[in-house]
């Protein structure tokens, strides 16, 4: 796949992004403790943007990875990758780094991803602008989408905007979404979606579910 050039934006997942945490020095960001520290400091700066105080667990990551649709030539697009807990799980689960495109709006976290996962295409930008961010190079090549953005915290119109952006780059594919809600984090029918819980794990903090949402028109 040809390198995809990101166009960074000033927009945020929820609102203003708040002050950015300093990136760990030397090799600290490449360790689990270093990545967790970056994540925690970002949570302190903007709790609503993060959705959780700690990165996703290996247990949740393995369930997300198991639910990803695999195809020989399809790319996997991850939105809101944070410091890469789910990214790592998908690689362990057999998704080649060259098939992964991850989007992260926080520059410090995007840099951690680049350092930690060589071979993965890391785009620092706004997931609501996916068509502009990915450009024509990814057209028709996205086979699966994983969303880690805490959509339950967003108003309906913002949720719809993100869903429309996903549909624009991966028509009819839908997306996987992991959430800490007991029930569906999205009002699926209001958003033109069909929702199904794919997995649940109590081994995450907090306990988490993996949902698959597909466009009603695609069923």
Positions of predicted regions on the chain:
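Class I SAM-dependent methyltransferase Rossmann-like catalytic core
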Residues: 34-70
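Conserved class I S-adenosyl-L-methionine
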Residues: 73-82
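Conserved SAM-binding loop of SAM-dependent methyltransferases across substrates and taxa
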Residues: 83-95
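Conserved SAM/SAH-binding beta-strand->alpha-helix loop
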Residues: 106
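S-adenosyl-L-methionine
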Residues: 109-139
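A short glycine-rich, Lys/Arg-flanked "PGG" loop and its adjoining helix->strand segment in the class I
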Residues: 160-172
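Conserved beta-strand signature within the Rossmann-like core of class I S-adenosyl-L-methionine
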Residues: 171-181
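Active-site capping/gating segments
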Residues: 184-219
